[in-house]
């Protein structure tokens, strides 16, 4: 994004607490925190010790282990709408998988996202995505065929009338609404009073799943995420590196009857080592 804001990229040498140092020995207060997941700061001692302990036991197994059960139970406890949890390698994988699951569960193809909201770099989500795409000054990235995005419908955030118009135009064809409950990739936009409640109602009336992308809001808007803060229960939720203290990991989860459609218990494919 330096092309958009001018200047040269800073090459970081080390980071600790709230500070980062670059290769020229300049010291900065880090207000970015790796774009969100470092709520405990850089090089947190507890995270470092946990990582060292884990490395002593191996790097990757390609099999189940107790750690994933422990973290899944904790996620479900803090975000009760996530009755079942599936771990992924990133927030992008989480949103991709949640959308595939929503389409398979509802037997519908189209999804609704909001203009300026970023849900990862999956091809079908790079439509009016804000964030880094603003660098290009284009609504979508080159290299994404139009056929990949033809089922992605874009609505205006905080405009419930616009959402209703989209559902009226594409009746019985929309599998899910995916949204950042509080968009953070086009500035920081809070939902108008009643907006999320009306979105929930539209989904219920149209047999459509509501997906909260809590990659940014999860455990930071409040410990229980946006679903707890606003009292709105989504059908599926997605979270990212926040659950790994900054390490590359993510998760999605939600209603038990929906999640059970995912393989191996169901016929909707998802995998990852």
Predicted regions and their residues:
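Conserved N-terminal phosphate-binding loop of PLP-dependent enzymes in the Aspartate aminotransferase
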Residues: 1-273
